[in-house]
UniProtKB/Swiss-Prot annotation:
Highest taxon of the lineage: Bacteria
UniProt family annotation: Belongs to the TACO1 family.
GO function terms (MF aspect): DNA binding
Keywords: Cytoplasm, DNA-binding, Transcription, Transcription regulation
Protein name: Probable transcriptional regulatory protein Maqu_2154
Any one GO BP annotation for this protein: regulation of DNA-templated transcription
Localization annotation: Cytoplasm
Pfam family, one: TACO1_YebC_N
Any one Gene Ontology cellular component term annotated for this protein: cytosol
Organism: Marinobacter nauticus (strain ATCC 700491 / DSM 11845 / VT8) (Marinobacter aquaeolei)
Coiled coil: none
Claim: Cytoplasm is one of the keywords in the record: yes
Gene3D superfamilies according to UniProt: 1.10.10.200, 3.30.70.980
Length: 241
């Protein structure tokens, strides 16, 4: 799992959008999390995790506060999640997660990115079964046995635990996110998460090579340029530079 996760992080770094896109992405997610679960980060773990990630990505405080204030006031856009699946260059598998206030527009924009790069958008569920929908927590530590024990005592369904270079990474089903985070924070006072996310991790990878590489990069760029796109997950494995 760790390798797939690292591949994704490296891919994200290469295709990171401009700052304004990052701010907009977090603004929407924070607004939706606050609207759904309340504006208090201590009571709303999803909101707290988003705020912590936004700060690590250098999102200004005023952007975060504006999104929460908008949720508090009950005003603002009515975003809904949308997910699209399909096959990218080299026949790699792709999941595109969006937040949209206009599903028809979003579908049209995402479909255009697929068709412009000779890719195929599929039906719901077309490739999702080939990914694990995981909650991921990474933090400094070496005693993975103590971590596993704390999670087991809290009745958390643990998928995997990895320990490497003084860092422990915990993988659980996405539905266990809140329970796992609460268990870790209760067991290890002052714990600071380097990673605190829900991701789709591929069960297998597809090698993308030759002429498919620039097409794949163009495909990701087109998707990441769309305001409604929040995350792009894929199983592509690119040659090491």
């Amino acid at each position: 799992m760790g390798r797939a996760y690292q591949n994704r992080k490296e891919s994200m770094a290469k295709t990171a959008a401009a700052k304004t896109k990052v701010y907009s992405k977090y603004g929407r997610e924070i607004y939706m999390a606050a609207k759904a679960g309340g504006i208090d980060p201590q009571a709303n773990l999803s909101l707290r995790g988003l705020i912590e990630r936004a700060k690590k990505d250098q999102v200004p405080t005023h952007v975060i506060e504006k999104a929460i204030d908008k949720a508090k006031g009950g005003a603002g856009e009515d975003y809904a999640p949308a997910r699209y699946e399909g096959y990218g260059p080299g026949n790699c598998m792709v999941i595109v997660d969006c937040l949209t206030d206009n599903p028809n527009r979003t579908f049209g924009d995402v479909r255009l990115a697929f068709t412009k790069t000779k890719c195929k958008i599929g039906t719901p569920g077309a490739v999702a079964h080939m990914f694990d929908h995981c909650a991921i927590f990474a933090f400094a530590g070496q005693d993975e046995e103590a971590v596993l024990e704390a999670l087991m005592e809290a009745d958390v369904d643990v998928t995997d635990i990895e320990s490497e270079d003084g860092k422990i990474t915990v993988f659980t089903p996405n539905t266990e996110y809140a329970k796992a985070k609460q268990a870790l924070e209760a067991a290890f006072e002052g714990i600071e998460f380097d990673v605190d996310e829900i991701q789709f991790l591929p069960k297998t990878t597809t090698v993308v090579e030759g002429d498919d590489i620039p097409m794949f990069e163009k495909f990701l760029d087109m998707l990441n340029d769309l305001d409604d796109v929040q995350n792009v997950f894929h199983n592509a494995e690119l040659p090491q530079e």
